[in-house]
């Protein structure tokens, strides 16, 4: 008795599984078939049928039921097909009219767009014409620089504008030489100011400004023969492109260079390892590691 009661659930479950499986299979097969039956097949019109429909459409875009039935009998198609054809034909006609209107507007718009690039080109040409003279002037400035100047590229900007200006560094104001040669040597010495950490020594050299007023003026303590000898030696040293005291325009055998003035007594010792500034009022030392 218990075994009989236990069997029906399994049998029922088995049947339920099979029936549920069949229910799952049948809808997947049966439901898509019904929309296919409801979907209308695409009607293909022949050339003769289209000619008759176009002739009626030329007469009126909205034919009544009687006209549609008459045409349906002629072309051997149901009246509903004729009605749908007229509906689609009217939509196509409206679309063509919109395209024509948009095409007319697009024809006008490109003319405006064509004129605007010409204006842009003219404006670009005008700007290029305005900026072309600075480019041409920058060429001689670079060509006028000497070969040693290319070694000291960071200092090639400020000395070109005015090598003996009061706003330049103390090394440029204090070195005795003519204006033509100062353009090259001031550029070579400008990078050595990096040892000073960007400090301006203009306050220590204020009495020296009046001596560099003329283009060919030199410092009073230095004689012209000494200047020319130092220049000749410094040119040979700069051509060798050696880094040290010789590349900075000093004699290769000399260890220090002293400048003395009556108005302001100060001493400048230039070595490869250290740099000393001495003054009567304040004495300080800056050593480069």
Swiss-Prot record:
Low complexity: compositionally biased ranges: 95-106
One GO biological process term: regulation of transcription by RNA polymerase II
Amino acid composition bias (Polar residues), ranges on this chain: 123-140
Signal peptide range: none
UniProt keywords, alphabetically: Developmental protein, DNA-binding, Homeobox, Nucleus
Pfam family, one: TF_Otx
Disulphide bridges, residue numbers: none
PROSITE patterns: HOMEOBOX_1, HOMEOBOX_2
Domain of life: Eukaryota
GO MF terms held by the record: DNA-binding transcription factor activity, RNA polymerase II-specific; RNA polymerase II cis-regulatory region sequence-specific DNA binding
Determines DNA-binding specificity (site feature) positions: 87
Subcellular location as annotated: Nucleus
Location of the DNA-binding region in this protein: 38-97
Record-linked InterPro entries: HD, Homeobox_CS, Homeodomain-like_sf, Otx2_TF, Otx_TF, Otx_TF_C
GO cellular component: nucleus
Primary localisation category: nucleus
Segments of this protein annotated with the region Disordered: 93-140
PANTHER family: HOMEOBOX PROTEIN, HOMEOBOX PROTEIN OTX2
Function noted in UniProt: May play a central role in the initial events of axis formation and in particular in specifying anterior head regions and their spatial relationship with trunk structures. Activates the head organizer gene cer1 by acting synergistically with siamois and mix-A/mix.1 through the 5'-TAATCT-3' element of the cer1 promoter. Also binds as a complex with lhx1/lim1 and ldb1 to the gsc promoter to stimulate expression.
Similarity-based family: Belongs to the paired homeobox family. Bicoid subfamily.
The name this protein goes by in its record: Homeobox protein OTX2-B
Gene name per UniProt: otx2-b
